[in-house]
Regions:
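N-terminal export signals
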Residues: 2, 8-27
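Short, polar/charged alpha-helical segment
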Residues: 31-42, 47-48, 52-72, 154
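Extracytoplasmic ligand-binding site segments that recognize negatively charged/polar headgroups
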Residues: 50-63, 75-90, 98-234
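A ligand-binding cleft/hinge motif common to bilobed small-molecule-binding domains
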Residues: 109-113, 236-255
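Short beta-strand->loop
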Residues: 120-129, 142-145, 171, 248-266, ...
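Periplasmic-binding protein-like
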Residues: 150, 178-188, 210-213, 219-220, 252-278, 290-314, ...
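A bilobed periplasmic-binding-protein/Venus flytrap-type ligand-binding module shared by bacterial periplasmic
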Residues: 153-160, 197-198, 268-280, 299-300
């Protein structure tokens, strides 16, 4: 996972205005380089996308939209947490039966490892130039490219907690009054939760999690699992939840409200890559091109995800980036820290 600064996102917002209506028109066009890839991809007929980035509903919507834009190429969506996606990819490799054409994880360490082991196909999407400027060229060598931008914060069930009572800071959830009322994902499964744990340890030390454990949080797998628990009324406050999933759930009538912690919101970027042994490499290349287009960002925005193409406005209900304080570990801190916090988490929470 790559981290992004507030200054970068503000520049992106300014760039969006410059694209204007012309960008929307371009979304309906298929340029020559995509048409050539489409012809080759049609002969392959399909691609398989291992993804731990967008939720299942968004991922399926992306798959359908891709096939509508490029008829004759089906997307097999395999949605899981990022760690499970990586385990599945590794198992395929050990078995000598490649299944994955595009691998998308929220754990940046996966890409560093795969690149070192020469397990990625080098490909530089021409459409990468359409991305928010700061998102271009994730890897100077061209082995992986940005496909996801997310904000992780807190949320609460409005039927169980009033606005006045709701936590305002990441540290507020450590108060004893929140015992048996909290929900959080697991860094052993979710790359985003792993990054959040690294950042909390950086800010407060591991004592933050020792104190959190005393409040007996409900621990799921994905960063999205707490939202399900809040909707069901099982818990009152979700920690390190994605803004997109929470806003979408609230828009559908669930009693949820997001919290922008005073210390800052975790801001992250994640890339995707083509395995070197991908069975449908042309379809995979076409998919890499697609995820940089306005067409892709338009689809994900309808489900409240943050667009990565500057021609598409942010989702409704989210704060302007100028009003959001962002926090994040460095890439080096994240790569080194995620494996460490996984082990510490198991020792502390016993799971």
């Amino acid at each position: 996972m790559v981290l992004i600064s507030k200054r970068t996102l503000l520049r992106a917002s300014a760039a969006a205005a410059a694209w204007g209506a012309a960008g929307a028109a371009r979304a309906q066009e298929i340029p020559p380089h995509e048409r050539a890839l489409h012809e080759a991809a049609r002969r392959e007929g399909e691609l398989t996308w291992y993804t731990g980035q967008y939720n299942a509903e968004t991922s399926e919507a992306v798959g359908r939209a891709f096939t509508e834009r490029y008829p004759g190429v089906r997307v097999n969506v395999v949605r899981s947490t990022s760690q499970v996606a990586f385990q599945r990819l590794s198992q395929d490799n050990r078995a000598g039966v490649p299944q994955c054409d595009v691998f998308a994880s929220t754990d940046f360490g996966h890409y560093s490892l795969l690149k070192r082991e020469n397990r990625l196909l080098q490909y530089r999407p021409e459409n990468d130039a359409q991305l928010i400027p700061a998102l271009r060229g994730s890897d100077p060598d061209g082995y992986y490219h940005t496909s996801f931008m997310g904000l992780y914060l807190m949320a609460y069930n409005t039927t169980k907690v009033s606005e006045a009572e709701a936590p305002k800071k990441w540290t507020d959830v450590l108060e004893p009054r929140w015992r048996d009322q909290l929900a959080v994902g697991h860094p052993g499964f979710s790359g985003a939760v792993g990054i959040w744990a690294v950042q909390m340890r950086k800010m407060y030390g591991w004592d933050y999690f020792t104190r959190l454990e005393r409040n007996r949080p409900q621990i799921g797998r994905s960063s999205m699992d707490p939202v399900t628990g809040l909707n069901a009324g099982e818990r009152s406050v979700g920690i390190a939840v994605p803004s997109a999933t929470t806003l979408l759930s609230a828009q559908r009538g669930n009693p949820l409200r997001i919290i922008y912690p005073e210390e800052g919101v975790l801001a992250t970027l994640s890339p995707q890559a083509i395995p070197r042994n991908a069975p449908h490499p042309n379809a995979a290349k076409l998919f890499m091109e697609y995820t940089a287009t306005t067409a892709f960002s338009t689809v994900i925005r309808t489900l409240f995800n943050d667009p990565i193409n500057p021609a598409v406005d942010p989702p409704p209900g989210s704060r302007p980036m100028s009003e959001v304080k962002l926090i994040y570990p460095t890439q080096a801190e994240a790569e080194r820290g995620v494996p460490e916090v996984r082990e510490l988490w198991r020792d502390t929470f016993g799971i």
